[in-house]
Amino acid sequence: MSHKAWQNAHAMYENDACAKALGIDIISMDEGFAVVTMTVTAQMLNGHQSCHGGQLFSLADTAFAYACNSQGLAAVASACTIDFLRPGFAGDTFTATAQVRHQGKQTGVYDIEIVNQQQKTVALFRGKSHRI
């Protein structure tokens, strides 16, 4: 694990009101890699009483943000897609793992997998980053 990646993540987390509000915690960091978790609360449920897709997107996007900023070079999302594969419910704990697939001078591609507490895949997210 990279000490620099952890420092960068903690510096970002200090200002990340969204991640804090969603109860997202950083579990692991390295260059181009991040693992974050979130427990689904009743406030995160949609009208079908399953986890709202926007909450899943936010979890994946947070892992993506920490991974693509792990080297200390500021980056933002330029495009993202997500595939929802199975529902989640109140009390479920989701883990999002982000891994770099390509990092050029300006643009990067990252894949994020969200799994539940049974290690079953809940969603797959791909993010494209741009360094600013």
Segments from the language model and where they lie:
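A generic structural signal for short beta-strands and their flanking turns/coil linkers
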Residues: K20-L22, G32-A34, V76-C80, D92-F94, ...
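Detector for glycine-centered tight turns/loop "hinges" at secondary-structure junctions
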Residues: Q49, G72-L73, Q119
